[in-house]
Amino acid sequence: MLLLPSPADGRGTAITHALTSASTLCRVEPVGRWFEAFVKRRNRNASASFQELEDKKELSEESEDEELQLEEFAMLKTLDPKDWKNQDHYAVLGLGHVRYKATQRQIKAAHKAMVLKHHPDKRKAAGEPIKEGDNDYFTCITKAYEMLSDPVKRRAFNSVDPTFDNSVPSKSEAKDNFFEVFSPVFERNSRWSNKKNVPKLGDMNSSFEDVDIFYSFWYNFDSWREFSYLDEEEKEKAECRDERRWIEKQNRATRAQRKKEEMNRIRTLVDNAYSCDPRIKKFKEEEKAKKEAEKKAKAEAKRKEQEAKEKQRQAELEAARLAKEKEEEEVRQQALLAKKEKDLQKKAIKKERQKLRNSCKTWNHFSDNEAERVKMMEEVEKLCDRLELASLQCLNETLTSCTKEVGKAALEKQIEEINEQIRKEKEEAEAHMRQASKNTEKSAGGGGNGSKNWSEDDLQLLIKAVNLFPAGTNSRWEVIANYMNIHSSSGVKRTAKDVIGKAKSLQKLDPHQKDDINKKAFDKFKKEHGVVPQADNAAPSERFEGPYTDFTPWTTEEQKLLEQALKTYPVNTPERWEKIAEAVPGRTKKDCMKRYKELVEMVKAKKAAQEQVLNASRAKK
């Protein structure tokens, strides 16, 4: 602190007092270029002075302007101002070599240079001919600047840049040089991405993560490319609101279609690259090798575990096998013994049957009349078929140890017992069939005059007609009805409707009832046609030594086997019917011959019925 010097001796000190006003508060705001620079530095987070940054920016832009060399567009003066939309705006301004990379400052500078050179006033002063109004080519320069100076319009034009290569390399082109072919294509198309930092294609040494990021980016590519520049209609030219809406709707649909085609192009590009990428193949092979190694390791561990289990299982199986073989051997021995016994019994029955035939033959079948002899032969065959071994032995002992009269009496007694047994079986079957028929008629509820009074003969005739005229016959049910009306002895006229109703009711019968009806029909047929044997032209009549004929109806499979055997063994084949019988299991030679005769008669009857129906239809016409 500075103090005044003390006064000299003898001198006084003069003190002056003055009054001062009170302090006042003032609001002062910072202004000036330095404060402006401070604020801009703070906002831009820059340490250098704002003026230095602005100077550097201006210097860089000026250097760019100095370096920018405009290209002369040779076709400029030949452009049609009315067709300005189809011109290359960058080429018009001399920026064809820079294109979408040109800055706004460069566009402005290029336009300024073009104006100084091609303005109508300049050219007019130089003595060049000019066109009036918008017909001069200078209009193309103005339109180009309008399009490129507006960011929205420029983006629309960049989307349809005529110099952009939209081609997609094929798989064959990139077979040997994948990276050289696809790298520039992806680099070229990356300009359409909304996202920055577009991943590169990379090279053969790229990691799996980098390749996965690359393809994930391009498979989910977000493009800003739009096609409004190609709109055929301009809504500004619309005369009313409805027309403007219609134009907007048409333009939106066209843009959407072009956008879809663009995304399909990008997808095709990515698909082709993915399918040709050698790294993908390498990664798949590595993954496959890894899985194979893991699989082999698991298989090896499982194999060792299975070996231990297999040893234990083999021991158990061996013990079980030995026990099973022992059991099977016992069963086989028992079956062999049973088969031997059965064969012995068959041989014994066959021997006794032959013995019975020979005994009867020795006594000339106990008759001097040919018809009675044939009938006795049939009865003997019936005995051979139905008698058991003990009964056959007893009967043979009687025949060999007695006189002719006693033997005949014993034989007739045995025949009477068998016939009585057969008669009882038939009566039971007929009663069962009648009861079933009554139940069926009650359940059917009647079907006209023809649905009542169906006799047993009519039922048998209906079954025969249904089998005679199978499905597929023309006017089948009319033919069946006509056949029944011709051959029926009841005198009742049946219609096709009556026949259909009765056939449906018979179909509801159980298999045993159907078999009984079929047997009934066969017995009736035999009674009518089997009394006097008829000679077959295909083979001579002969005595049958086989077992008694079975009356079981022929199945479809047996019918097919019989037809095939008839084709296989023609008429001139020696022992034809023996071979045919061998081809049809379960049927004897006599069965096959009788079935053949039945089929011949059925075919003849079928042809006659069809001929009658045909004649009736012709008569109606």
Swiss-Prot record:
Phosphorylated in M (mitotic) phase. The modification Phosphoserine is found at S47, S49, S60, S63, S183. It is found in: Nucleus; Cytoplasm, Cytosol. Keywords: Acetylation, Activator, Chaperone, Chromatin regulator, Cytoplasm, Nucleus, Phosphoprotein, Repeat, Transcription, Transcription regulation. Acts both as a chaperone in the cytosol and as a chromatin regulator in the nucleus. When cytosolic, acts as a molecular chaperone: component of the ribosome-associated complex (RAC), a complex involved in folding or maintaining nascent polypeptides in a folding-competent state. In the RAC complex, stimulates the ATPase activity of the ribosome-associated pool of Hsp70-type chaperones HSPA14 that bind to the nascent polypeptide chain. Residues 88-161 form the J domain. The ZRF1-UBD region specifically recognizes and binds H2AK119ub. The ZRF1-UBD region is also involved in protein-protein interactions with other proteins, suggesting that it may be masked by some regulator, thereby preventing its association with H2AK119ub. InterPro entries: DnaJ_domain, DnaJ_domain_CS, Homeodomain-like_sf, J_dom_sf, Myb_dom, RAC_head, RAC_head_sf, SANT/Myb. This is DnaJ homolog subfamily C member 2.
